[in-house]
Design a protein with these regions (language model features):
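Extreme N-terminal starter segment of soluble prokaryotic enzymes
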Residues: 1-4
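Short glycine-enriched loops at secondary-structure junctions
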Residues: 6-12, 59, 100-105, 154
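Short catalytic helix/loop segments, enriched in acidic residues and glycine
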Residues: 19-43
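Glycine-rich loop at the start of a catalytic domain that most often binds anionic cofactors/ligands
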Residues: 60-73
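A glycine-rich helix N-cap at a beta->alpha junction
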Residues: 71-90
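Active-site glycine-rich loop that binds ribose-phosphate moieties when present
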Residues: 82, 118-143, 151-155
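Active-site rim beta-loop-alpha module in soluble metabolic enzymes
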Residues: 139-201
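C-terminal accessory domains and tails appended to enzymatic cores
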Residues: 189-264
Length: 264
């Protein structure tokens, strides 16, 4: 059984501010915290029956996980400019997806909430407002892989359950404001992630891939109106529908996803 882990950083316990998620005095600590939560998910996946685990480093430069500290049984994709970005490698025949360290969508309550980048105000596909968890789970669905588990703050967990239904979740911290949270004790967090990953993998037959029916209509609202004109001028098929919003339509979900990657 093959399990795929996409790992972000903003939803990791102890991380509450953007300064912790990029190069600076606190960054090495954040990398260690991220690696530990990923390791907990790996341990749980193998305990639940996984025979192979692939981790895709999915935050910013995508060179965050400390490979020498990573569970030796897992392989790692690192580096950015990947065709499927945060979901690179999910097309290689996996049985389930686990999202670690994820966060709420742009504009929603949640610690460091955003959607792929700070320039995005909102993303809608076929009327559904999506964050990274929703979008990436749908990408997995394109390859017939179900989302089985997600970790992050309590708002991320609510967002995931609202869209995907009975997916296993672990809330590692409680949202207070966009830059404040109450994190659970780390030993408790790692124990919970490991146990939940084991449960999710053991019960993997209970999960179904999430798909939306095509054709697909995407609307993206930007924080800065100049980006609307730039996207419409440079990307074939993209149209400005108002001063801050573009649209793109396709019969293929992955085409929509790749256009979003191009503008985010």
């Amino acid at each position: 059984m093959k399990i795929y882990i996409s790992a972000d950083m903003e939803g990791i316990a102890g991380i509450v501010h953007g300064d912790q998620t990029e190069e600076g005095p606190e960054f090495m600590q954040s990398r260690k915290l991220m690696t530990e939560e990923v390791n907990a998910a790996i341990r749980g996946a193998f305990s639940g029956g996984a025979t192979e685990v692939l981790v895709n480093d999915s935050h910013n430069t995508m060179r965050n996980i400390i490979i020498e500290d990573l569970d030796h049984r897992a392989s790692l994709i690192s580096g950015n400019k990947k065709p499927l970005s945060m979901m690179e490698g999910v097309d290689m025949g996996f049985d389930g997806v686990i999202l670690v360290g994820y966060h709420a969508r742009a504009g929603a309550p949640g610690v460091i909430s955003h959607t792929y980048s700070g320039i995005i105000r909102s993303l809608k596909i076929n009327g559904y407002e999506l964050g990274e968890a929703g979008l990436n789970g749908l990408v997995a669905g394109c390859f017939n892989v179900p989302l089985i588990m997600a970790t992050g703050d309590d708002k991320l967990c609510e967002e995931v359950r609202a869209f995907f239904g009975e997916v296993e979740t672990v809330a590692v911290k409680r949202y207070i404001t966009r830059s404040a949270a109450q994190s659970r004790p780390l030993k408790e967090v790692y124990k919970d992630i490991e146990a939940t990953a084991k449960k999710a993998v053991k019960g993997i037959k209970n999960f179904k891939p999430k798909r939306l029916e095509g054709p697909y209509a995407m609307e993206v609202a930007f924080q800065n109106i100049i980006l609307t004109d730039m996207a419409a001028a440079r990307i074939p098929g993209v149209k400005a529908i108002d001063s801050s919003t573009i649209s793109f339509n396709s019969t293929e979900f992955l085409d929509v996803f790749k256009v979003f990657l191009n503008i985010s």
